Regions:
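N-terminal flexible segment immediately upstream of the FAD-binding catalytic core
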Residues: 1-179, 197-234, 263, 381-382, ...
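Flexible, glycine/charged-enriched surface loops at secondary-structure junctions
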Residues: 66, 128, 137-144, 258-263, ...
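Terminal amphipathic helices with adjacent charged low-complexity linkers/tails
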Residues: 82-100, 419-515, 543-589, 784-787, ...
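Flexible inter-domain linker/hinge segments
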Residues: 85, 89-119, 177, 246, ...
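Short amphipathic alpha-helices in soluble, non-transmembrane regions
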Residues: 127, 131, 180-181, 407-412, ...
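FAD-binding subdomain of flavoenzyme oxidoreductases
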Residues: 218-228, 234-409, 413, 716-718, ...
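Activity-critical C-terminal alpha-helical subdomain
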Residues: 507-511, 516, 545, 572, ...
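Ferredoxin-type iron-sulfur electron-transfer modules in oxidoreductases and energy-metabolism complexes
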Residues: 662, 737-758, 774-847
Length: 847
């Protein structure tokens, strides 16, 4: 590990120098440079070499900068001349063979980049020529804005932008489109709403064409069907790009329930829901996507269309002992395969959700995360609405989650098999970290500190049944003194209760919108043990952070240089060390409550400031250390679909702090290990993607690889996904937690306010549904989520241009004008945003 992890300039990402070097040149180059480190004399060659790497990294990752070189040949020629001059200077000063090898590798990379820039226009023409007759030129995108918006999903992890984005407008176009892309020798990534939480649609190669299904958004209607036994039921036929909320609304109009309702229903799409086997708050009653799908169409990697139909649908949540039969037909209607699946193959026995069995006996599409084809349409069963619904809010008070865990377990068990009795179609929990993040207003008088909240929707067909359900709930809670029950008195009040649940994205605001967002599933009986584990983990992280706070301040005092009276500071420093030792001993033995209040760390901090009163420079630095160290506290925040044990674990993290990122990564690994220890699984909704692949069992990986090789031997679909165990170490995220020169540039160019305003965007897509300039039928995709990604990339480009050329003549700003002009300033997005971004104001600032 180098002493200075950030010698490569223009790197406004989470990647440290080791990661950048490995990304560009492979691990061999990193080893060579480590060996050459001790050979530096003046360091000039190293600075030029690292600047070269900074140039290459940002040109590769930023479509606006890359396109700028394509559009301006003279600028490109001058730039490459200056790079060659720098490499020549390094070469002239070289004294050993390894340096010449490094220069040769750099020139090879430079030649490759030059070829890419010189040939990209002809490559785009080749792609357009092949696809134009299938989907139309207007549905083929190479512009930097679109490529940037498709470089990541809700995770913000990324590696490469896509080569192109295509948006078919008819389902019939999909099969020939896939076949044509295959003939071009390119790979394919399916994408719907971009709401994925594991990086499933993040491009991992330079040659991926992303097929966006958002224009396939027709709701074909609600129809009547019959099971093989003659039982009538309703179903809804949908194209893959239909937004989940729209499907739910269409069902609601007919007093029916569309049960596949992930939290991201405002932006997620039907195809993605099936590819992930998504569930949501009603999964406790009706199951996930696989429980509710009747049939679907999928285009396989070679362009063949397949129709998959579930025979004799049970119209209920799949039981562990049930056997499902799916028939797979080709485009001519011929049955080519019959797949049988047992309930315990879909979900591990004892669990409410489980998406870790990727193979599912070879069932196409479902749970495959876009690795075996593209789902183009589907029919889902619909459930009759209950006549009555009542919403309850449970508030848990106290210093730990012990009682909350027991209450949730007892409620879930009591209402497990409702039959004709009152049923719970939603049990949604969030903990104290979310309570703080969303500024939750306590509804009950309480018994002290609010520890967690549980929202419940209880349904029934008669008043008597609903009353009995409420009585049962009250009886369960009678033995729990720290739990308060509040019933919503009206539908409007119920809506207000649930509004808090929709604002949980605010958890990442403290760390500029980046967090590790994982989900696990546990047996209901293990919930109390897990809550206790999280409580203890968070307590120990507070202990660690407060120790680090004191250690960092005392370490600074050993090197502090005051403007006056340095000899007096020496004696005061010795006194500060004594205070530090005393308070650190107390921290080692401190209770949860004491650590929560930061009692001993605060005593030390205030004591040191008082001790050094008058040493303004020193005390101001101590305040900065306090703020910086406190912000590095690792916190596990949890919310969950309580009825099926599906827990969502969020760890907010500062993406520019590599050590914090590593610590957060270890925390996520610890959570996964604990889930397995408690007989759970590492995902019930989010999928595996790039973030969880290393936690998938070897047996499941081998089974999926075997299936994938059979259906996609050329590796056309979603390359790198669910196959590269080290990919999580290669992806990175942008980071505008900038200091020094970059912050000064932002201020000088009037971009500081713009950058600060969009910095908290969590890419949830809630803005999309209400945005007038999101209109797929008219090729308008300028909703705030996409715009914020584009603006962030443009700010990065402007920082680079300013630092690299020492100029503020920004030709690249015309892209910002285009983004800003696509806004009606209606402010509808503002009311939807969980982190309170007013994108109307963003557009005004951009203009």
């Amino acid at each position: 590990m180098r002493t200075n992890e950030r010698e490569i300039p223009y790197n406004y990402t989470s990647a440290d120098d080791d990661q950048v070097i490995t990304h560009l040149f492979g691990p061999g180059m990193l080893k060579t440079l480590e060996n050459l480190r001790t050979k530096r004399v003046t360091g000039r060659s190293a600075r030029l070499l690292f600047r070269f790497m900074g140039d290459m990294f940002i040109i590769e990752r930023n479509p606006f900068i890359f396109q700028d070189f394509v559009d301006h040949p003279v600028k490109k020629r001058n730039f490459f001349k200056s790079i060659e001059k720098d490499l020549g200077i390094i070469e002239a000063g070289a004294r050993e063979n390894r340096v010449f090898q490094v220069i040769e590798r750099c020139r090879e990379y430079l030649d490759t980049l030059a070829r890419r820039i010189n040939t990209i226009s002809s490559e785009q023409k080749r792609i357009t020529k092949a696809l134009d007759t299938i989907i139309g030129r207007e549905n083929i995108y190479f512009d930097p804005f679109t490529l940037t918006a498709h470089a990541t999903d809700a995770t913000d992890w990324r590696l490469y932008p896509p080569l192109a984005v295509v948006r078919p407008s008819k389902e019939s176009q999909m099969a020939p489109l896939v076949a044509a892309i295959k003939e071009l020798g390119l790979t394919i990534i399916p994408r719907g709403g971009g709401t994925g939480l594991t990086g499933g649609s993040v491009p991992l190669t330079r040659t991926s064409v992303m097929i966006n299904t958002e224009k396939l958004n027709t709701i074909r209607g609600i129809k009547q069907f019959k099971t093989e036994s003659g039982e009538a039921f309703s179903g809804i036929e949908l194209e893959a790009g239909v937004i989940t909320d729209h499907a739910m609304a269409a069902a609601r109009e007919k007093k029916l329930i569309f049960a596949t309702d992930p939290t991201s229903a405002w932006a997620s799409t039907i195809g993605g829901n099936l590819a992930e086997n998504a569930g949501g708050k009603t999964a406790v009653r009706f199951g996930t996507a696989i429980d509710n799908v009747l049939s679907y169409t999928i285009v396989m990697p070679h362009g063949e269309e397949r129709f998959v139909y579930r025979k004799d649908h049970s119209l209920t949540r799949i039981s562990p002992n049930e056997t499902l039969v799916f028939q797979v037909k080709d485009a001519g209607g011929r049955i080519v395969e019959t797949i049988r699946l047992k309930g315990d193959q879909i979900r591990k026995p004892g669990l409410g959700k489980d998406v870790t069995n990727k193979t599912l006996n070879g069932l196409p599409g479902i749970q495959k995360e876009g690795c075996d084809g593209i789902i183009t349409s589907a029919t889902f069963i619909l459930h009759p609405e209950y006549n009555l619904k009542k919403t309850f809010c449970l508030e848990f008070f106290g210093n730990d989650m012990t009682e909350a865990g027991r209450v949730i377990t007892e409620i879930s068990t009591a209402f497990e098999n409702p039959g004709d009795e009152a049923a719970l179609i939603a049990l949604e929990h969030f903990d104290e970290e979310y309570i703080k993040a969303i500024d939750y207003k306590t509804k009950a008088a309480g018994h002290g500190k609010l520890k967690a909240v549980l929202l419940i929707d209880m349904v029934a067909d008669t008043e008597d049944t609903l009353d009995l359900g409420e009585s049962l709930l009250g009886a369960i809670l009678a033995g729990f003194e720290k739990t308060e029950l509040i019933a919503a008195k009206s539908s409007k009040e119920a809506e207000r209760f649930w509004r808090d649940r929709k604002r949980l994205g605010a958890i990442a605001k403290r760390t500029n919108a980046f967090k590790l967002n994982e989900d696990i599933v546990l047996p209901i009986a293990s919930l109390a043990d897990f809550f206790d584990y999280v409580d203890r983990y968070n307590t120990e992280e507070k202990r660690y952070n407060q120790n680090m706070l004191i250690s960092s301040i005392t370490a600074y005092l050993d090197t502090a240089e005051p403007l006056e009276d340095p000899q007096w500071l020496v004696s005061k420093t010795e006194r500060a060390r004594e205070m530090a030792a005393r308070e650190q001993k107390k921290i080692a033995l401190a209770s949860r409550e004491s650590l929560e209040e930061e009692t001993h760390a605060q005593d030390f901090y205030k004591g040191v400031l008082e001790l050094l009163r008058g040493y303004t420079l020193v005390t101001e630095t101590i305040k900065e250390i306090y703020t910086r160290t406190s912000s590095r506290l690792i916190v596990i925040a949890t919310h969950m679909h309580a009825g099926d044990g599906n827990i969502h674990v969020n760890i907010p993290v500062l993406s520019n702090d590599r050590e914090m990122m590593k610590k957060a990564g270890k925390t996520a690994d610890d959570i996964m290990a604990k889930a397995v220890e408690l007989n759970g699984v590492v995902s019930g909704e989010h999928g595996i993607g790039v973030t969880k692949f290393r936690h998938l069992s070897k047996k499941k990986v081998e089974a999926f690889n075997s299936y994938r090789t059979r259906v996609d031997p050329l590796g056309i679909m979603n390359p790198g996904k669910l196959s590269d165990i080290d990919v999580i170490d290669r992806v990175y995220t942008p980071s505008f937690n900038l200091l020094g020169l970059e912050a000064g540039i932002l201020k000088y160019t009037s971009l500081e306010s713009l950058a600060a305003t969009i910095a908290n965007c969590v890419r949830c897509g809630r803005c999309k549904a209400v945005c007038p300039v999101f209109y797929p039928g008219k090729n308008l995709f300028f909703h705030p989520r996409n715009k914020n990604l584009g603006i962030g990339s443009l700010i990065e480009a402007l920082l680079y241009v300013t630092q690299r050329t020492h100029s503020t003549r920004f030709k690249i700003l015309h892209h910002l004008e285009e983004i800003a002009d696509h806004c009606t300033i209606c402010h509808k997005c503002h009311t939807q945003c969980p982190v309170n971004i007013d994108s109307g104001e963003v557009s005004v600032m951009a203009r």
